C-alpha cells in the first residue's frame, strides 16, 4: 500500500491532463534521473506535499483519486502530513453520508476514513463536462501506462503546435507523446 500511495502522489507532480492508452505506438520518452528510482531511491516528502497541492488546485477539478482515503495523507512514504493537517484537509470537503434517522442522505465534513471526493457524480457526468472524454483516475496511472513516470513527464512536455496539414478541433491539442497525437486536456 505504501508503494501504491507513493506512486499515486508522484503522479500528481506531473499530471493535469487527459490521456488515453499509447500501447499501440512506440515512441522514445524523455528520461529523467528520478530520485525514487533504484534500490536506494526515495521520495521527497516536500515534493509529495507540493504534488498533493498541484493535484488539489489543478488536477482534481477533472481527475479523481478514488482509491485513496484522506488517512493515506499521513502515511510514511507518502506526503506525511500531520494527523491534524490531514483532518483539516478531509474536513474541507463535503461528503454524502446516511441515511439519517429519517432515511435521508445528508452532507457532512470529510473524515480521515473517507475516500477522496470525486470531481463528478459518475462517468457520464465527467464525459458531459469534458467534451465526451473521461479523465482517467490518477491513483494508478503510473502503473497503467507504458513508460510509467517517463511517459507522464514526456506527455506534460510534449505539447506543441501541430505539424503543417494537421487540423485540430476546438478543445483538442497536439501532443507528440500522446497516442494519435491528440489530447483534450489543455496545456
Positions of PLM-derived features:
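Electrostatic cytochrome c docking/interface patches
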Residues: 28-53, 64-83
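Post-cleavage N-terminal segment of exported redox proteins
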Residues: 2-9, 13-42
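Extracytoplasmic/lumenal ectodomains and periplasmic regions of secretory and membrane proteins
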Residues: 149-187
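C-type cytochrome heme c attachment motif
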Residues: 53-65, 117-123, 134-143, 151
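A short, polar/charged loop/turn motif at coil->beta-strand junctions and beta-hairpin connectors
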Residues: 28-30, 110, 132, 177-181
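Stable alpha-helical elements in mature extracytoplasmic
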Residues: 44-47, 134, 148, 152
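A generic secondary-structure signal for well-formed alpha-helical elements
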Residues: 58-70, 159-163
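Structured domain cores in non-transmembrane regions
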Residues: 73-135
Amino acid at each position: 500500500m505504501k508503494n501504491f500511495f507513493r506512486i499515486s502522489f508522484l503522479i500528481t507532480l506531473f499530471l493535469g491532463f487527459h490521456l488515453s492508452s499509447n500501447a499501440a505506438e512506440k515512441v522514445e520518452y524523455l528520461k529523467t534521473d528520478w530520485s525514487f528510482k533504484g534500490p536506494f531511491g526515495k521520495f521527497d516528502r516536500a515534493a509529495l506535499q507540493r504534488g498533493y497541492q498541484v493535484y488539489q488546485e489543478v488536477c482534481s477539478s477533472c481527475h479523481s483519486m478514488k482509491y485513496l482515503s484522506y488517512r493515506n495523507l499521513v502515511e510514511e512514504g507518502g506526503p506525511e502530513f500531520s494527523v491534524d493537517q490531514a483532518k483539516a484537509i478531509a474536513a474541507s470537503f463535503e461528503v454524502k453520508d446516511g441515511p439519517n434517522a429519517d432515511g435521508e442522505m445528508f452532507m457532512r465534513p470529510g473524515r480521515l476514513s473517507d475516500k477522496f471526493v470525486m470531481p463528478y457524480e459518475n462517468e457520464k457526468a465527467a464525459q458531459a463536462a469534458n467534451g465526451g472524454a473521461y479523465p482517467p483516475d490518477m491513483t494508478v496511472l503510473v502503473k497503467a501506462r507504458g513508460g510509467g513516470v517517463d511517459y507522464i513527464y514526456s506527455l506534460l512536455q510534449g505539447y506543441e503546435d501541430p505539424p503543417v496539414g494537421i487540423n485540430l478541433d476546438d478543445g483538442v491539442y497536439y501532443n507528440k507523446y500522446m497516442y494519435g497525437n491528440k489530447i483534450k486536456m489543455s496545456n
